Amino acid sequence: MNYSNIISDFTWSYSRLTAFEHCPYKFFLSYIKPHSERPLFFSDYGTFLHKIIEMRLNGKLCQDELVTFYLTNFRKEVVGAAPNRDIFNSYFEQGLNYLKNMDFPYPTPNAVEHRVDFFIGDKPFTGIIDCVAKDGDNIIILDNKSRALKPRSGRKKPTKSDLELDEYLRQLYLYSIPIQTEFQQYPERLEFNCFRTQQIIPEPFREDALEHAKLWALQTIDTITQNEDWSPKMEYWKCKYLCDHSHQCEYQLMNRG
């Protein structure tokens, strides 16, 4: 069934576009016929660390308060169950180690958790930029990531990790549109703060990559608007641990027998 009459009124976001790419039925349950969501370990964990980093940069927590806040609030904030004890322990320890010696590259950023509203063509978009900072006269967009991304390999043929990096960069390229409007210049760099691995991954801004991201966004919106088949993409790990609707997904429930 086509839902273009509903979809035409959407304000878009990067997460809304990727939700459809990951699973059309997840998109359906999230945005067309909204259902309640269940807590998930990975998203709860990422949200909690984002919150602590924001509080540190906004001055609501000082450096020597970070670990105590993390330890006393972890189980209240990270409600979803981890896939296994090893993953829980690994994530917990990596978050703790990051906060013990948090070395954020821009301790006095221009903006933290900066909301932006903008258009691509005639399509309205919204988003939250984790950090906007200046390096001299240059603008930097930084995204805090719980995912352990890898720096670009530099190989002639892109690796799987290079392609994954490019996928995540699309979000920051879209955010560069309102940043250009606000600061009258595009960012000089796009960066990921992969806090679990304590690695900053910088990427120089490229206008051709921006145009590619804009084209991807508009083509994805067109695909969603015309879509009539909302069948799921069934993958055990993603359905069980990454989908916040799997507890009420008929397809997943049938698979459980």
Model-derived features: positions:
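RecB-family 4Fe-4S metal-dependent nuclease core
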Residues: M1-G257
